[in-house]
């Protein structure tokens, strides 16, 4: 506890405290045990789909192909239908609560990192050079920001992802903050969740052992459109022109689905809005008819009936993170000794024999210390190589060998390239470990400005987030804990750090520890070792405003070296750490790239930067997920990250979020397409949503301490 200087009136006396006083208080160590607690898992954003063809490939450790979001219902099994209006990553896929019986069966497609697009039509075309893939586009009036989904290709149409804010028609935009490349917006259309009518993933041949692509329609809920009532009726002519008495459809988006029920028909009609006419009427077109879902044809005679819109069953505002919150805060330790985890795995490249029998064992899953679950419609599905799906029932399923072997009978005979979606119960759970890496460095040598590069020594680049002038500067790795310093060069050379020289015989290059603290006995300065340069010299980053004094005794806090400081070599680089904040990239559904964000009202740097930081690394970990046990106890006080918009303390969760791989490209790492989750540290299995685990844990109890000033001061 730090007590500041001041005067207090105690027992009739004025008591002066001349300087700051530090009082050591034992940390609270009182704990409460929770011997058994249920932890439920939701896992990702649920999009309900039907009319399914094929099976999607999860993206938690494979970014070969994404899930593409389209604005029309499917009409092809090997491409998307309509306009591409967004992208997402697949987490899991399973039947939604009932057995598969055909195209009308609903499935739960669990997604993460869902992004919908904004489409701009510019006043003049942009080339690939002017608008490279992943370019950052900013509206000069609105301040809206987005990243290009593709390069310009001499087109006036630009689609943006990761959009924040709202672009305005007529405003100017600037590309990659280059004032020489600007355009104005002729028209703008913002796509949202309500525009998603189908999904597509180009699995074949991009992903090994997936014989077909994945295609599905979104399940559409009925919604009365704004400005209309449930009793309003639509008048549909044989030509497809539709009106509503006393009402106008102006403002309705094309590709909206109109739902209506005709007399003596058991299946609803679905028609697509192809055009909104100037008189407020709409032109309707057909969609594919799906048994048990919709009749997509236009009526053959004039029809007057009530109607609604069809909107997908998804809500991004209720995004569920890929982690599970434990019941209490300030968890101190966790007991997984009796816990298990229900996980999913696609078994690939299976075949049925001549009798329609398929058998596989635990080795096919690649998961150890597990057994297959008993049959349930949500737990198992069989997807043939031609994209069709087996109507799988419990009498076809045989579990044997203590849950190690599954046999499925009654399949189509002599089929290959079968994908079986399975569910297992994993035991012997283990927390992944995070290694605390100290004093790592990143040099930023790129600039957005093409002039004076001979004076700055930098290279002009277009990738936003990789240049010194950018408001957000990517650290190109995830899970950064703290930034120790940001240093700007004063010339064309790289920035340097202060160096301390000590007497010979200490073998600092082998005996000192990278990242340990050094304390000056006279100056009270504290610094962190950033490099072990030689047997007598180290490089440092100051952690205090006080500086070391030549000749004083300094102490290396971990290696217990105590010696006299012979020489201080100041770098001359500018310390500009205070103009930045750190965004650690702790998103609800994944570990994103950590980044520096320049504070408002500060001018951008003009020369090369050197950034020194500490981070967590999980590259050698072999566990199943992250928990409080993933962190060293000494990190518990200030170095535990907070997850997502609700700032959930990571040590109070079971954390399944995938981690982005290190970035080394030239485009912006902040664009959807440049986030990659192919790191081997990410799990090869998925946590089955809507399941739970039983764990034990302890958590710290709060306490209140009182500091009393007596008359002795």
State what each model feature region is.
Residues 1-713:
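Subunit-assembly interface segments of extracellular/virion macromolecular structures
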